[in-house]
Amino acid sequence: MTGQSLWDVSEANVEDGEIRINVGGFKRRLRSHTLLRFPETRLGRLLLCHSREAILELCDDYDDVQREFYFDRNPELFPYVLHFYHTGKLHVMAELCVFSFSQEIEYWGINEFFIDSCCSYSYHGRKVEPEQEKWDEQSDQESTTSSFDEILAFYNDASKFDGQPLGNFRRQLWLALDNPGYSVLSRVFSILSILVVMGSIITMCLNSLPDFQIPDSQGNPGEDPRFEIVEHFGIAWFTFELVARFAVAPDFLKFFKNALNLIDLMSIVPFYITLVVNLVVESTPTLANLGRVAQVLRLMRIFRILKLARHSTGLRSLGATLKYSYKEVGLLLLYLSVGISIFSVVAYTIEKEENEGLATIPACWWWATVSMTTVGYGDVVPGTTAGKLTASACILAGILVVVLPITLIFNKFSHFYRRQKQLESAMRSCDFGDGMKEVPSVNLRDYYAHKVKSLMASLTNMSRSSPSELSLNDSLR
């Protein structure tokens, strides 16, 4: 057969230019000119083979006597392939598995762009849906796995109190201080902490009003002594709170790796640094410039509001979302940067001779930023018709640019919020009143890993079950 194609060697033997195809028992005669319309497909390439070896590379078997080509493929899908050779279009029935169909047409060398317009949208949509469902399933699985690891770490920390002096008492204090909502005591402590934080923030804000300031001997505005009392009480409470948590912490090294504990520390450190600086300035007048350091540190009191994250599921979820959404945030900043760069140059070109506020490109950066973020302060506005049209395009582009990444970030926020709720529900269900369970000859981590895993599986169905129904004690029995 060397040097000749299959059609050349079979032309005299194949009646009416036909070849026989057998696909899993489904037999058909096909005209060669029909197949040669699509020479890049498997059957089209089959007609151009010059040797038996080349033929067997494209089919599973070849009968020399019957001139029949056998393919070990699904016979139920081959009629769709036949229809393609006759019409040049692929059609996909709704009951077919799109992935099986995709693999089949890939085998026959038929590209997906041959799918007719009536089926194309549905076909590609059905291919995307399972990928989205798979992503959601992986997201839920990651949520369950992460929650399981965290709840297991929680149990390991609780077990460290066993065998220590006043271990059970310290464990109850640790649970009350670190887990708002765990018990009546923890709820009361949480409410008091929130009130002190809010009182400290309100005091700082009121102290900036001239009506609440008292001039000192040099006529400079100073703090009202009543506000100083509130401030000192707040610092005393925050210090007590931090020291108490540290005293009952199961792991002192791990204590300061917790972001919430670092926030507690940073909320009181500026006060003590300011106190030391003021004492140094009073004793050494030549270091009066250090007083400015004290003024800057006093402004850091506003960060005390972050202490509310310990008592708010939403704030903790927001922090986790920002931590794990750096790619989406970077994408958002990239989109905004590109838009700002383009529209600022356009606005500068149009308005530089008519508007002093837009006479430089850096000035146009500010205008483009407030326009794309739809803030629109109105301090600088274009005056020409072309400038107003540019501003309109800038605002519309900003809306589109901001909306796209925000959707991804919101999905992650929902994911972390759901996971945080699962953790809180599990911790509220814990009861260590009689201490940890004794498990002779069994590794404590392995034991609780086995028991808590079943709990976390049930927590994934919280939407169908009330949190009060999820009792950890029941799962440990």
UniProtKB/Swiss-Prot annotation:
The chain crosses the membrane at residues 185-206, 226-248, 260-280, 291-311, 327-348, 389-417. GO terms for molecular function: potassium channel regulator activity; voltage-gated potassium channel activity. Residues 207-225, 281-290, 349-361, 382-388 are extracellular. GO terms for cellular component: membrane; perinuclear region of cytoplasm; plasma membrane; voltage-gated potassium channel complex. GO terms for biological process: action potential; potassium ion transmembrane transport; potassium ion transport; protein homooligomerization; regulation of potassium ion transmembrane transport. SMART domains: BTB. It is found in: Cell membrane. Residues 1-184, 249-259, 312-326, 418-477 are cytoplasmic. It is a multi-pass membrane protein. Potassium channel regulatory subunit that modulate the delayed rectifier voltage-gated potassium channel activity of KCNB1 and KCNB2 by altering their kinetics, expression levels, and shifting the half-inactivation potential to more polarized values. While it does not form functional channels on its own, it can form functional heterotetrameric channels with KCNB1 and KCNB2. Each regulatory subunit has unique regulatory properties that can lead to extensive inhibition, significant changes in kinetics, and/or substantial shifts in the voltage dependencies of the inactivation process. Belongs to the potassium channel family. S (TC 1.A.1.2) subfamily. Kv9.2/KCNS2 sub-subfamily. This is Delayed-rectifier potassium channel regulatory subunit KCNS2. The gene is KCNS2.
